[in-house]
Amino acid sequence: MTDDDRIKLEPSWKAALRGEFDQPYMHQLREFLRGEYAAGKEIYPPGPLIFNALNSTPLDQVKVVILGQDPYHGPGQAHGLCFSVQPGVATPPSLVNIYKELQRDLNIPIPSHGYLQSWAEQGVLLLNTTMTVERANAASHAKKGWELFTDRIIQVVSEQCPNVVFLLWGAHAQSKQKLIDGTKHLVLKSVHPSPLSAYRGFIGCGHFSRANSFLEQRGLGPIDWALPPL
């Protein structure tokens, strides 16, 4: 049995990424994570949720991709979807700004929570390019191998899915544009929604309405960006 046979991954992703789990970088990443757990470090998100973005949004259902950097590093926040937090956790500042733009762009009331699972289940792949982090230690798992894996995920979406909208917010996300076939897909770029930059172009970008217009023009259902109450 190879390592990828033991990974709990949604079938379409497991088929598309078969072989990645036997690459040298993945063996190194696995050993790094084993060492972190063995040292008693608290790693987020919890193990069963590390691949939540993939398990919530099958490859053949991807309509929109939003890229984040690494998971939230506070207790109880991260659950494997970028920008999203678990129910009962305060909405982080960047997500508040995303909500402000949704309100401006589509007149959607600002939700009382930060749980984006309904977006994922509609085809929004909420992908952090680094998929784990140590508690209270931002970017602690950067450059350990995750970026190679998530680059491959972006490439697979670009190659195998038609008519996807990629929302690239900030320099880190925009560095991934080279992995995307811009002749097949819509790539929308803006500054990051963080409080440091949101009012330098994110607020006013219109990405959510533009994404839905693109999808509807191609006979695909729009995303309902309004979140259900918890």
Curated annotation (Swiss-Prot):
Transmembrane segments: none annotated. Its main location: cytoplasm. The active site is at D70. One of its GO terms (cellular component) is cytoplasm. It comes from the Bacteria. CDD domains: UDG-F1-like (cd10027). InterPro entries: UDG_fam1 (IPR002043), Ura-DNA_Glyclase_AS (IPR018085), Uracil-DNA_glycosylase-like (IPR005122), Uracil-DNA_glycosylase-like_sf (IPR036895). It catalyses: Hydrolyzes single-stranded DNA or mismatched double-stranded DNA and polynucleotides, releasing free uracil. Its EC number is 3.2.2.27. It is found in: Cytoplasm. Keywords: Cytoplasm, DNA damage, DNA repair, Hydrolase. One of its GO terms (molecular function) is uracil DNA N-glycosylase activity. Signal peptide: none annotated. GO terms for biological process: base-excision repair, AP site formation via deaminated base removal. Belongs to the uracil-DNA glycosylase (UDG) superfamily. UNG family. Excises uracil residues from the DNA which can arise as a result of misincorporation of dUMP residues by DNA polymerase or due to deamination of cytosine. NCBIfam families: PRK05254.1-1 (NF003588), PRK05254.1-2 (NF003589), PRK05254.1-4 (NF003591), PRK05254.1-5 (NF003592), ung (TIGR00628). This is Uracil-DNA glycosylase. It comes from Pseudomonas putida (strain ATCC 47054 / DSM 6125 / CFBP 8728 / NCIMB 11950 / KT2440). The lineage of its organism: Bacteria, Pseudomonadati, Pseudomonadota, Gammaproteobacteria, Pseudomonadales.
